[in-house]
Amino acid sequence: AVEEAHLPGRVEHRLVAIGLDGSRQLLASGADFYHSPQVSDDGTQLAWIEWDRPDLSWTRTRLMRATLAADGSVAQVQSVGGADDAWQQPRFDRAGQLCCLSDRSGYWVPWQVAADGPRKLLAIAADHAPAPWQQGSNTWLPLEDGWMALSWSEAGYGHLALRHSVSAEERRLAHAYSRFRHLCSDGKALYCIGASPSCTAAILRIELATGELTRLLGEDSALDAADLSRPERLLYLSAGGESAHGFFYPPRNHAQQLDQPPPLLIFTHGGPTSACYPVLDNRIQFWTQRGFAV
């Protein structure tokens, strides 16, 4: 666990192990921040992310690895990532090999951290995670036999697939959904929270062997399909010739016919903290139902 200690005149972050009896054991200290501790399946390795001020979690971090003894103590602590790279979501595969997302190639994509240095795994040139603002992100998973479960974003839309790290064979999943979070697997199925233009959030189960999708929890919008405004990707030039991105929602109400251009509401955000996603937002539907474009 990541522990935050409020001490006289300062706040200190540390990595600790907490026993079932409530006992606490210090694992790592000295860095300004700690993130995403991960234990290998056999319990013999520990990985985590750490960094110091003035760096941020998406500008420059250290990927750390250590061995775990039977009593929970750590040894052979070493930094295994590049000195000027940013890392997030460390994971151990079934063979105990450390893998992690890094943006050293320009996008957040998975890398395998071998003894001779990091090696990029085959993945689409797109961000497979947002900026790591919070603990607990889980947007990718190493699976059996070189397969990975990956979610990524292209042109604002989220995608989900199984992809082989060597052959690049790919199986797209859950086509109707446009945002995916909190991936996990029991070895037979992939579970996640998915959202779509007609569904705010749903717990999904996807069979790894067949891709069959079952929605375990969550419902579509109660709006009639003719009244549901769906996002349309928008790209326009901003100050300095830069491209700006957005989503346009036209007014939708089968009981109303507009004979003139609708009033337009514009919502801006400072992303990526409060980025906009192409998923059902009832606040937007409130306005499009009443003749507004958003």
Q: Where do the protein language model's features map onto the residues?
A:
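Short loop/turn segments that connect beta-strands within beta-propeller blades
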Residues: 19-22, 68-72, 114-117, 164-168, ...
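Serine-hydrolase catalytic core recognition
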Residues: 91, 184-189, 193-294
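Surface-exposed loop and turn segments in beta-propeller and other repeat-based domains
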Residues: 78, 119-133, 219-231
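A flexible loop/linker signature enriched in serine peptidases of the S9 family
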Residues: 2-14, 28-34, 49-64, 79-88, ...
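Residue-level detector of Asp-centered blade-edge/turn motifs that repeat once per structural unit
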Residues: 41-42, 93-95, 142-145, 185-187
